[in-house]
């Protein structure tokens, strides 16, 4: 199935890591990942910028290289860019698709939805690449889904760190902070979700 997605530019040499602090606004207990090998491990990859090189905590796919991460927000959010630190040995994701304000996406229906934006990713072990979003598309967000369909050749995908840069508005819309955010919700392994539904990409 064809997706209405476009690649976006990315910037090298992110010089203000402190900006990538929307993570502190996240309720990581509500973040979920589909097809993660260890249940709940995705909650530990939304680290502080200072801890981005921590290799003890990561999320790894289980049945194949695909991961779906669902991130609900507690307030209206604008996302400006995304940083991804993946694993070595070909386990870093090489593609990312984003879907906004749809909390019902899983492997059984993801091909039924057009993604909001798609990026071709590079192997980045330092967090030096920020993938910019389309400004007109990533406003008024209350839920973000990130889909990683493939990697650089490993049987499984590993992600050590995700940071979201943007603007977080308090629930009462009284305070605006430049920061990052993320949370998801869904099931664990693809075998529990599919029940025979095909999820081939085209």
UniProtKB/Swiss-Prot annotation:
Q: Which SUPFAM superfamilies match?
A: Galactose-binding domain-like
- Check the record and name the Gene3D superfamilies matching this protein: PITH domain
Checking PROSITE patterns in the record gives:
PITH
Query: Could you tell me which InterPro entries the record lists for this protein?
Result: Galactose-bd-like_sf, PITH1-like, PITH_dom, PITH_dom_sf
Coiled-coil region(s): none
Taken from the UniProt entry, a GO cellular component term is: cytoplasm
Pfam families noted in UniProt: PITH
Q: Which domain of life is it from?
A: Eukaryota
Identify the residues that the record assigns to the PITH domain, covering every copy: 11-184
Stored PANTHER family: AD039 HT014 THIOREDOXIN FAMILY TRP26 (PTHR12175), PITH DOMAIN-CONTAINING PROTEIN 1 (PTHR12175:SF1)
Protein family: Belongs to the PITHD1 family.
Q: What is this protein called?
A: PITH domain-containing protein 1
Q: Which organism is it from?
A: Dictyostelium discoideum
């Amino acid at each position: 199935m064809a997706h209405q997605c476009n690649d976006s530019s990315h910037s090298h040499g992110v010089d203000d890591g402190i900006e990538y602090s929307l993570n502190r606004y996240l309720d990581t207990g509500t973040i979920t990942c589909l097809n993660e090998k260890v249940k709940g491990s995705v909650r530990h990859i939304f680290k502080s910028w200072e801890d981005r090189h921590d290799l003890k905590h990561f999320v790894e796919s289980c049945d194949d290289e695909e991961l779906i991460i669902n991130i609900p927000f507690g307030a209206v959010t604008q996302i400006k860019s995304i940083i991804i630190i993946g694993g070595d040995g070909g386990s870093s994701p090489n593609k990312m698709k984003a879907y906004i304000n749809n909390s019902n996406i899983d492997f059984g229906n993801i091909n039924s939805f057009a993604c909001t934006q798609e990026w071709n990713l590079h192997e980045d072990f330092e967090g030096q690449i920020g993938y910019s979003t389309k400004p007109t598309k990533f406003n008024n967000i209350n839920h973000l889904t990130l889909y990683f369909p493939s990697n650089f050749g490993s049987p499984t995908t590993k992600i050590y760190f995700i940071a979201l840069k943007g603007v977080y508005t308090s629930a009462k819309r009284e305070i605006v902070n430049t920061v990052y955010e993320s949370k998801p919700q869904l099931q664990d392994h693809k075998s529990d979700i599919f029940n025979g539904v095909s999820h081939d990409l085209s």
